[in-house]
Amino acid sequence: MNRLIVLCLFVAMIYATIALPKKEDISNDERSISVSKVPVKKSVAIAGAVIEGAKLTFGILEKILTVLGDINRKIAIGVDNESGREWTAQNAYFFSGTSDVVLPASVPNTKAFLYNAQKDRGPVATGVVGVLAYSLSNGNTLGILFSVPYDYNLYSNWWNIKLYKGIKRADRDMYNDLYYYAHPHKGDNGWHENSLGFGLKSKGFMTSSGQTILQIRVSRA
C-alpha cells in the first residue's frame, strides 16, 4: 500500500513538471514585449526646425535635401547662432524659386535653424535664389543670400551674409546688395570666413552643385 502511494506521488510530480512552462520561456516572452513597446525616436532633421547648434552637420542638411525629392535645383540651409543674442525671423524674399517652409520664429543663442527651398514647380527654367532676414536682439538685422542658378553655363552658386544696422526686411534691394555689391562668396565646396562688424564674424560653406547645401556659423569675433 505504501509503495502504491509513493508511486502515485511520483507520477503526479512528473506530470506537473511537463505541464508547467519553464521560467526561461516566460522571461523571453516578457523581453520581446518590452522591446516592442519602446518608442522609436523621430529625427529632428526637418526644414523649419531649430536644433542644437553643435548638432548642425552636413549629414543633417543632406537628409533635408533628400526629403525634397527629385528636384534638380534645390537647397538645404543650416545657420548656427553663436552670436550671444536671440534672433527673430523677419521674412524670406525670393528672386526665383519657392519654399513650403516657414522660417522659425526665433533662434536662441547656441541653436541653429534649418530651412530649404527649391525651383518653381513645373517645367520651368528657373533656379532658386533668395534672401532670409533675421533681426537680432540688439536691433540689427542679419541678411543671408543663397543663389542656385538654373544655367551653369552662365552662372555659379553664390552665398553671402551681412549684418545691417537697424531692423530690415528681406527685399529686392537687400538681394541686389548681397548679390552684386557686398562681396558674395562663390559656392566652391570650400569654407569662407569674414567679419560682420558689431563684434560678430561668420564662417560658411556652400557646395557647387544644383542640389546644394549651405552651412553658416555666426559667432562672436
UniProtKB/Swiss-Prot annotation:
Positions marked as site (Interacts with the lipid membrane): 202
Annotated site location: Important in the initial contact with the lipid membrane: 155
Residue sites binding phosphocholine per the record: 96, 129, 147, 149, 175, 179-180
Region (Trp-rich region, which is important for the binding to lipid membrane): 147-162
Region (Plays an important role in the hemolytic activity): 45-54
GO biological process entries: cytolysis in another organism; monoatomic cation transport; pore complex assembly
GO cellular component terms attached to this protein's record: extracellular region; nematocyst; other organism cell membrane; pore complex
Quaternary structure (record): Octamer or nonamer in membranes. Monomer in the soluble state.
SUPFAM superfamilies: Cytolysin/lectin (SSF63724)
Domain notes: Composed of a long N-terminal alpha-helix and a core region rich in beta-sheet structures. Before the pore formation, the alpha-helix binds the lipid membrane, partitions into the lipid-water interface and stabilizes the monomeric molecule on the membrane. Finally, it traverses the bilayer, thus forming the transmembrane pore.
Residues cleaved off as propeptide: 20-42
Primary location: secreted
Signal peptide region: 1-19
N-terminal region: region residues: 53-72
Organism: Urticina crassicornis (Mottled anemone)
Record function comment: Pore-forming protein that forms cations-selective hydrophilic pores of around 1 nm and causes cytolysis. Pore formation is a multi-step process that involves specific recognition of membrane sphingomyelin (but neither cholesterol nor phosphatidylcholine) using aromatic rich region and adjacent phosphocholine (POC) binding site, firm binding to the membrane (mainly driven by hydrophobic interactions) accompanied by the transfer of the N-terminal region to the lipid-water interface and finally pore formation after oligomerization of monomers.
Record's subcellular location: Secreted; Nematocyst; Target cell membrane
Protein name as annotated: DELTA-actitoxin-Ucs1a
Chain span(s) of sequence motif Cell attachment site, crucial for protein stability: 186-188
